[in-house]
Amino acid sequence: VLQQQDAAKIVANDGLGNPTLDTNQRQIKVLLRQGAGYRLVAENRSWLPSAGDVDMPCLADPLLDEGSIEINRGVLKVSLSYWLSCGSWGVSRDTYTFRWQQNRLRLIGWDGVEFMRNSGDMTERSINYLTGRQKTVTGGNMFEDVPAAKIKTRWQTLPPQPARYLDGPSLPSPQDWESVGANADCSQFHLYKNKESNT
C-alpha cells in the first residue's frame, strides 16, 4: 500500500474526533516475483479509503485500526474496519477476497460483520461472487455467548453480478450492496468514500 505525502492534505480539525485528518490518497499495488525481481500485476489508485475523512472526523483509520492486507497462495484479502469515537455505536469490518486467476485478481468474496458497542448485537453477512449466494446470520452478540436456538441463518440468491477485479473497471463499496437488490437486505452497511487503488 502506497500513500501520497502531501502536507496540504493533512487537515486540522477543531471539532470532535482526531485533531488532524490525513486525507492523502492511498493506492494498492500487487507485485509477483519474476526472476531476480518483481513485476506489477495489478493496481488500484482510488479504492482504498484515506486515513482520515473530513466528513467523518471521528472515524478511525479504516485500514490501520484493526484492518489488514494479506496474501497467501494466490488469495488476497483486504479488511477495512469502521469505528467512530463519536456519533455512532456501530462498528463494522469488511473483508474483500480476491483470487489470482487468468492473470488477474478477481473479487470472489466479501464478508462483513457489524455490531453495536452498547448492546453487542451483531449481524454477519457473506457473499460468494462465484455462486451468487449470500449468507446472513443474525441474533449473535459480540460480548456474550448466545444459545444456538436464537441464531438465525438465511441464504439468498443474488441477482447476476459482473466479474470484478482489483484493477477495475470498478469495485463495490458498502453503498453498492443496497443496489444489489432488495432481496440482499444489505442496506445497513456503513458508508465510506470509494477510492481506487491497485495491488
Regions found by a protein language model. Name each.
Residues K9-E43, F98-W100:
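Beta-propeller blade repeat segments, especially FG-GAP/WD-type strand-to-loop junctions
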Residues V1-Q5, L76-V78:
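Hydrophobic beta-strand segments that make up the repeating blades of beta-propeller
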Residues Q5-K9, L84-C86:
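Short glycine/acidic-enriched loop and turn motifs that connect beta-strands
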Residues A60-T199:
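Acidic, small-residue rich beta-repeat scaffolds with periodic aromatic anchors
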Residues A36-L59:
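Blade-edge motifs of beta-propeller repeat domains
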Residues L16-N18, D55, W83-C86:
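Intrinsically disordered, low-complexity segments enriched in polar/charged residues with Gly/Pro
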Residues L2, V30-L32, L171:
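Generic low-polarity alpha-helical segments
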